[in-house]
Amino acid sequence: MRSKFDEELNLLNDELTEMGDLISVRIIEAVRAFRHKDLIKAKFIMDNDEDVNEYERKIEERALKLLLRQQPVASDLRLISSALKMITDMERIGDHAVDIAEIVMTIPQVTKDETYQKIIVMADTSIEMLKESLKSFVTGDLSLVDNISRHDDRVDGFFDEVREDVVGEIRADTIGAEYAIDILMIAKYLERIGDHAENISEWVEYSITGQHVQK
């Protein structure tokens, strides 16, 4: 009976990792679409959001079956309940990739390289946070999430820089208001992705230690 449970739990871990890989790719694709005003790529992200939702449904169904059909001990219950919480944040990360893609469809111009470099760092850092959190969940190695809060602070710091840059350009009358709002919204969505990644790390910590501490 236990071997069957462990087999199903491994499948759950595999699906979580696959979902994480998918949304990581979508984030990068959305940011690159923003850089080059790539309408084809942006539309692909928007049209294929159901892929992320399907993973959420699959993982939720597997987790609930584990709860109902098996006899999980307390540590198993923490793992399963944490997975259910994590996929909610992961699905929202996928939604934010779509949000960025939707902005790309109407953005009036290609962004400046300096601003893009800050935005790509925000995206890369958020993806690193997500992947480290999922790896920690699968392996049980809590040390992998030790630096998550520091990474989130880095994302927040770059958001502040992007905002200051945009405000400066508005005052200098070098960009229009509509474009400024688009850039700020993209940066804000990436900041939220970082926040969701930090939430995931908190549920990972709970799954391992039994303590849910907000960072």
Name these PLM-found stretches.
Residues 1-215:
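Cytosolic, long alpha-helical scaffolding segments
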